[in-house]
């Protein structure tokens, strides 16, 4: 889940 957060870039 946290790793998907970086995709918010």
From Swiss-Prot:
Indicate where this protein resides in the cell: Secreted
Aminoacyl-tRNA synthetase in keyword set: no
Superkingdom classification of source: Eukaryota
Tissue specificity comment: Detected in the thoracic perisympathetic organs in larvae, and the dorsal ganglionic sheath in adults (at protein level).
Q: Assign the protein's first listed, main location to one coarse class.
A: secreted
**UniProt key word Methyltransferase:** no
- Cite the entry's keywords alphabetically: Amidation, Neuropeptide, Secreted
Phenylalanine amide PTM sites in chain numbering: 9
Output the Gene Ontology cellular-component terms.
extracellular region
- GO biological process entries: neuropeptide signaling pathway
Q: Which family does it belong to?
A: Belongs to the FARP (FMRFamide related peptide) family.
Protein name in the entry: FMRFamide-14
Species name: Lucilia cuprina
